[in-house]
Swiss-Prot record:
Its EC number is 2.7.11.1. It comes from Clostridium perfringens (strain 13 / Type A). The lineage of its organism: Bacteria, Bacillati, Bacillota, Clostridia, Eubacteriales. It comes from the Bacteria. Signal peptide: none annotated. Belongs to the anti-sigma-factor family. The keyword Kinase applies. The gene is spoIIAB. Binds to sigma F and blocks its ability to form an RNA polymerase holoenzyme (E-sigma F). Phosphorylates SpoIIAA on a serine residue. This phosphorylation may enable SpoIIAA to act as an anti-anti-sigma factor that counteracts SpoIIAB and thus releases sigma F from inhibition. It catalyses: L-seryl-[protein] + ATP = O-phospho-L-seryl-[protein] + ADP + H(+); L-threonyl-[protein] + ATP = O-phospho-L-threonyl-[protein] + ADP + H(+). One of its GO terms (molecular function) is protein serine kinase activity. Keywords: ATP-binding, Kinase, Nucleotide-binding, Serine/threonine-protein kinase, Sporulation, Transferase. This is Anti-sigma F factor. InterPro entries: Anti-sigma-factor_SerPK, Anti-sigma_F, HATPase_C_sf.
């Protein structure tokens, strides 16, 4: 492993931007293209938003954890919550599926993450939380 960071913050929607910028600053050492940077920022934004809205149901007292690591030319980003978990992971990963239909922009989070990253793994257990691991090779 070349480098690693860990960040913990309260599940407040205003911290989503902070998380995105922090990961961007961390990966700057790889000299990413604007497109790579935008892809990663978007994926991080979706993962953090999912943790806040779905995992913790907007309970701002809870904590979201982000870990990012660089190994050669690959970035690995983990976003984790200890929230309610995802009951049906397969269904949740379907485009346009949402557990919150009343929200304006919902149902595309996992699809966006899969589109912008090279790989996406999701681990979740009901009432224990969700861990999302995203990877992307840089400068390809």
């Amino acid at each position: 492993m070349d480098n690693k960071m860990r960040l913990e913050f309260l599940a407040k929607s205003e911290n989503e931007g902070f998380a995105r910028v922090s990961v961007s600053a961390f990966i700057a050492q790889l000299d990413p293209t604007i497109e790579e940077l935008t892809d990663i920022k978007t994926a991080v934004s979706e993962a953090v938003t999912n943790a806040i809205i779905h995992g913790y149901e907007c309970d701002e007292s809870k904590v979201v954890i982000i870990e990012a690591s660089i190994c050669e030319d690959e970035i690995s980003i983990t976003v984790e919550d200890n929230g309610i978990g995802i009951e049906n992971l397969e269904e949740a990963r379907e485009p346009l599926y949402t557990s919150k239909p009343e929200l304006e922009r919902s149902g595309m989070g996992f699809t966006v993450m899969e589109t912008f990253m090279d790989s996406l793994e999701v681990y979740s257990e009901k009432d224990k939380g969700t861990k999302i691991i995203m990877k992307k090779k840089m400068n390809t």
